[in-house]
């Protein structure tokens, strides 16, 4: 299986722009499977638009090595090449002492060649030192190439090439991207702006990234390097092991999916469908009522940006308030379930108020334990998740929580998963993944 990892020397070096551009350029002649290392929701939306294949997350905190390999094989088996965008710097993970949660960890697990991406502003000889340092830090990694971003011009590139080749004649110089503010992408408090808000503008930007990559990088060299990757196999003893719990049901799950709610892992949807669920997508912003279903799934997103329009859609609010099935709200979905977001009236199904703050309220990988059976898990079972939010809940008049947070923050006092309506409604800040919480899809899909 051809595969390549695009890894940064740090955050903010242009990983998403250039990785997406590479995916777009390769997609003109290849069936490309995109991946994002880490728990991010937003970068995969760019990958998906560039390749027309759903981008998947690979994460060595949520997943063990066998699960990473199994998931990779599941999605890459019929593809020509897989392009894997890293997270932060190559070696950044959850600890300064190991590589769990890092790009390096996933690259080693998949025996994937790595192309190092660096911001080359004001660098010449130091670029060689950076490359040598990254290569020698962990010799199990297969760092095969380098891309220079934000170069000043041809003279700058020539000096970079001379310096790097003088000290490391084996590294492949894939090319260089010039400084151009037009190539940058908007930022918002959770990272990059999600795509549904400006679809046409985004498609034009992705075309620009793809064209720039074709002009400035050696695409054939990227394919050549990926072709040299080592093969690997899933342990035969575990080849029938499922990645998540499966209990066949015939439930209908209504999934909120629009500009305000779009933070979802596609593998969660796959897991729900494997559990027999039929997914129905709807828009809390634009539709008048929730579709016929057994369960409503309100994912994360930016409801605070659209709070006025959400509040004004009274028919949808009434439809959800009168719904007599199960409702799960996650982060942004939790906020929508409360009485209000920054004073704008919401569903009033959880007695608390959501407010935005200027500072991050929760940013962490999460470990938790279910205190009871609930609509997304089973009592005493442990799970791994992720949280990243600038909002917090105040005036909390609920005291029933479904899970305890052992690593991370949660809603209050290390508790998360506020439960109401006799357990039929659960709202939490922890973003659940069907492998980090293998009971998630089966529990949510129950009738």
Swiss-Prot record:
It holds the Pfam family GATase_3. The active site is at residue 331. SUPFAM superfamilies: Class I glutamine amidotransferase-like (SSF52317), P-loop containing nucleoside triphosphate hydrolases (SSF52540). Its EC number is 6.3.5.11, 6.3.5.12. CDD domains: CobB_N (cd05388), GATase1_CobB (cd03130). Pathway: Cofactor biosynthesis; adenosylcobalamin biosynthesis; cob(II)yrinate a,c-diamide from sirohydrochlorin (anaerobic route): step 10/10. It comes from the Archaea. InterPro entries: CbiA/CobB_synth (IPR004484), Class_I_gatase-like (IPR029062), CobQ/CobB/MinD/ParA_Nub-bd_dom (IPR002586), GATase_3 (IPR011698), P-loop_NTPase (IPR027417). Residues 252-439 form the GATase cobBQ-type domain. It is an enzyme of class 6 (ligase). It catalyses: cob(II)yrinate + 2 L-glutamine + 2 ATP + 2 H2O = cob(II)yrinate a,c diamide + 2 L-glutamate + 2 ADP + 2 phosphate + 2 H(+); Ni-sirohydrochlorin + 2 L-glutamine + 2 ATP + 2 H2O = Ni-sirohydrochlorin a,c-diamide + 2 L-glutamate + 2 ADP + 2 phosphate + 2 H(+). The keyword Cytoplasm does not apply. GO terms for molecular function: ATP binding; cobyrinic acid a,c-diamide synthase activity. The record marks 431 as: Increases nucleophilicity of active site Cys. The keyword GTP-binding does not apply. Keywords: ATP-binding, Cobalamin biosynthesis, Glutamine amidotransferase, Ligase, Magnesium, Methanogenesis, Nucleotide-binding. Its cofactor is Mg(2+). GO terms for biological process: cobalamin biosynthetic process; methanogenesis. Catalyzes the ATP-dependent amidation of the two carboxylate groups at positions a and c of cobyrinate, using either L-glutamine or ammonia as the nitrogen source. Involved in the biosynthesis of the unique nickel-containing tetrapyrrole coenzyme F430, the prosthetic group of methyl-coenzyme M reductase (MCR), which plays a key role in methanogenesis and anaerobic methane oxidation. Catalyzes the ATP-dependent amidation of the two carboxylate groups at positions a and c of Ni-sirohydrochlorin, using L-glutamine or ammonia as the nitrogen source. Belongs to the CobB/CbiA family. Comprises of two domains. The C-terminal domain contains the binding site for glutamine and catalyzes the hydrolysis of this substrate to glutamate and ammonia. The N-terminal domain is anticipated to bind ATP, and cobyrinate or Ni-sirohydrochlorin, and catalyzes the ultimate synthesis of the diamide product. The ammonia produced via the glutaminase domain is probably translocated to the adjacent domain via a molecular tunnel, where it reacts with an activated intermediate. The a and c carboxylates of cobyrinate and Ni-sirohydrochlorin are activated for nucleophilic attack via formation of a phosphorylated intermediate by ATP. CbiA catalyzes first the amidation of the c-carboxylate, and then that of the a-carboxylate. NCBIfam families: cobB, F430_CfbB, PRK01077.1. This is Cobyrinate a,c-diamide synthase. It comes from Methanococcus maripaludis (strain C7 / ATCC BAA-1331). The lineage of its organism: Archaea, Methanobacteriati, Methanobacteriota, Methanomada group, Methanococci. The gene is cbiA.
């Amino acid at each position: 299986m051809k595969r390549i990892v695009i890894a940064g020397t740090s955050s903010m070096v242009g990983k998403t722009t250039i990785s997406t551009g590479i995916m777009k350029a390769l997609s003109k002649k290849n069936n490309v499977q995109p991946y994002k290392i880490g728990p991010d929701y937003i970068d995969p939306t760019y990958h998906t638009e560039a390749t027309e294949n759903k981008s998947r997350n690979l994460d060595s905190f949520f997943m063990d090595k066998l699960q990473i390999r199994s998931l990779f094989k599941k999605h890459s088996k019929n593809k020509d090449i897989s392009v894997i965008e890293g997270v932060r710097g190559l070696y950044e993970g959850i600890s300064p002492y190991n590589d769990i949660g890092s790009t390096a960890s996933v690259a080693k697990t998949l025996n994937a060649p790595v192309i190092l991406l660096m911001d080359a502003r004001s660098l010449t000889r130091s670029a060689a030192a950076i490359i040598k340092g990254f290569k020698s830090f962990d010799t199990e990694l297969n760092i095969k190439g380098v891309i220079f971003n934000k170069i000043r011009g041809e003279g700058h590139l020539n000096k970079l090439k001379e310096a790097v080749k003088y000290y490391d004649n084996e590294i492949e110089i894939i090319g260089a991207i010039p400084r151009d503010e037009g190539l940058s992408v908007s930022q918002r408090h959770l990272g990059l702006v999600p795509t549904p808000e400006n679809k046409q503008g985004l498609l034009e930007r992705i075309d620009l990234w793809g064209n720039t990559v074709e002009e400035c990088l050696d695409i054939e060299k990227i394919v050549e390097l990926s072709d040299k990757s080592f093969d690997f196999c899933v342990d035969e003893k575990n080849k029938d092991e499922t990645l998540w719990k499966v209990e066949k049901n015939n439930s209908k799950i209504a999934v909120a999916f629009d500009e305000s709610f779009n933070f979802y892992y596609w593998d969660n949807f796959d897991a729900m469908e494997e559990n027999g669920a039929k997914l129905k997508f709807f828009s809390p912003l634009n539709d008048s009522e929730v579709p016929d279903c057994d369960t409503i799934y309100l994912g994360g997103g930016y409801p605070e940006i659209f709070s006025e329009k959400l509040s004004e859609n009274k028919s949808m609010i009434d439809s959800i308030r009168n719904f007599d099935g199960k409702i799960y709200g996650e982060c942004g979905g939790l906020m929508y379930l409360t009485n209000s977001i920054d004073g704008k009236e919401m569903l009033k199904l959880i007695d608390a108020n959501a407010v935005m703050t200027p500072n991050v309220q929760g940013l962490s990988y999460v470990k938790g334990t279910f205190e009871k059976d609930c609509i997304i898990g089973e009592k005493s079972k442990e799970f791994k998740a992720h949280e990243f939010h600038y909002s917090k809940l105040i005036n909390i008049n609920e005291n029933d929580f479904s899970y305890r947070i052992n690593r991370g923050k949660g809603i209050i006092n290390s508790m998360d998963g506020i439960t109401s309506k006799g357990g039929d409604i659960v709202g939490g800040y922890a973003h659940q993944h069907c492998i980090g919480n293998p009971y998630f899809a089966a529990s949510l899909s129950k009738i």
